[in-house]
Amino acid sequence: MPANQPPLYLTFLLLILLYLIITLYVWTILTINHKTAVRYAALYQRSCSRWGFDQSL
């Protein structure tokens, strides 16, 4: 029955909303991961250089 089906624009709106939510979610995760990765890399580099410096002394 066609009465049970929601209007086409409503379906499109729902799909767009879902797409936006997923995109935002993925973008946030990637940004957070990138920031933490950079932070960890900097810490690792610092600790390694310090360790190497201590060993040379």
Swiss-Prot record:
Transmembrane segments: 9-29
Membrane topology field: Single-pass membrane protein
Intravirion topological segments: 30-57
Record bears the keyword Transmembrane: yes
GO terms for cellular component: host cell plasma membrane; membrane; virion membrane
Location, primary (coarse class): virion
Pfam families the UniProt entry points to: SH (PF01445)
Keywords: Host cell membrane, Host membrane, Host-virus interaction, Inhibition of host NF-kappa-B by virus, Membrane, Transmembrane, Transmembrane helix, Virion
Membrane-side (Virion surface) residue stretches: 1-8
Compartment list: Virion membrane; Host cell membrane
GO BP: any one term: symbiont-mediated suppression of host NF-kappaB cascade
Function, as annotated: Plays a role in the inhibition of the host NF-kappa-B pathway. This inhibition occurs at the receptor level, by preventing the signaling of TNFR1 as well as IL-1R and TLR3.
Similarity-based family: Belongs to the rubulavirus small hydrophobic protein family.
Name used for this protein in its record: Small hydrophobic protein
Organism: Mumps virus (strain SBL-1) (MuV)
Name of the encoding gene: SH
